[in-house]
Amino acid sequence: MTWSKPAYTDLRIGFEVTMYFASR
């Protein structure tokens, strides 16, 4: 799901990082 909203993009990046650390 690729959204064109900058705010959502930033939020998604933060979520990706959170999931990344959660997976470790």
Curated annotation (Swiss-Prot):
Pfam families: PqqA (PF08042). GO terms for biological process: pyrroloquinoline quinone biosynthetic process. There is a cross-link at residues 16-20 (Pyrroloquinoline quinone (Glu-Tyr)). Pathway: Cofactor biosynthesis; pyrroloquinoline quinone biosynthesis. Keywords: PQQ biosynthesis. Disulfide bonds: none annotated. InterPro entries: PQQ_synth_PqqA. The keyword Transcription regulation does not apply. It comes from the Bacteria. Belongs to the PqqA family. Required for coenzyme pyrroloquinoline quinone (PQQ) biosynthesis. PQQ is probably formed by cross-linking a specific glutamate to a specific tyrosine residue and excising these residues from the peptide. This is Coenzyme PQQ synthesis protein A. It comes from Pseudomonas fluorescens (strain SBW25). The lineage of its organism: Bacteria, Pseudomonadati, Pseudomonadota, Gammaproteobacteria, Pseudomonadales. The gene is pqqA.
